[in-house]
Amino acid sequence: MVTYVERDVRQMVNVRDLATFRRFVRMCATRTGQVVNLSSLAADCGITHNTAKAWLSVLEASYLVHLLPPYHRNFGKRLIKAPKLYFCDPGLAAWLAGIREAGSLAIHPMSGALFETWVVGELLKAGCNRGRTPALHFWRDSGGTEIDVVAERGTVLVPVEVKSGATLVPDYFAGLTRFRGLSGAREGLLIYGGAASQRRSGTRVFGWRDVERAAAMVV
């Protein structure tokens, strides 16, 4: 962290207050898996909105974070327009957020966000391993209905939901069902923290160990 701030960042942008920048990076880590709110981020760090925007661009350019853009089609709904923030390394995000023991992760408030961060990272990694940049987005309307990842494979949409829970419950499928009805997507994917992979009506379910199989259907 210190090496990154003091050496790499200074090559990209003139950061005068290194302590504040370190705080900014930590605040970003606690927001992994969330829609970017630059005003809130700036206020928490005591910096201006423009500075927060510039520093976030630095983190993205140095591959510390990835910004997942919103899917552009609204299907008659008002949409969230800001991107979602993901740390490229979920382990680093956990460490910066103060999580030091693997055993404490399961009960930590960030466990779901970190699991989602890991899955999104695996999808992006799968695309890179295939020599292409996958067209990944997220979708959320003003009513709060959200799809964690919407993949565009040519003209085909593949909605993906990510749930950290180990037991499947009906609520896990609600967003996928709604999005498929709005978009006409034929099939959705659910990646969850359990072990069993299976097929449900209109949804392929993958346990976390099968994330590579799921990624092959996305990228």
Spans of features found by a protein language model:
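Accessory nucleic acid-recognition modules appended to NTPase machines
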Residues: 1-157
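Switch/connector loops and helix/strand junctions flanking conserved nucleotide-binding motifs
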Residues: 95, 169-170, 197-201
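Arginine/glycine-rich "motif VI" loop of SF2 helicases in the C-terminal RecA-like domain
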Residues: 128-129, 177-186
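Short beta-strand/turn micro-motifs composed of small residues
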Residues: 140, 191-192
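Short beta-strand-loop-alpha-helix junction that forms the active-site gateway
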Residues: 153, 162-170
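Structural signature of nuclease core domains in nucleic-acid processing machines
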Residues: 155, 183, 203-205
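Domain-level recognition of nuclease-like catalytic cores that cleave nucleotide substrates
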Residues: 193-219
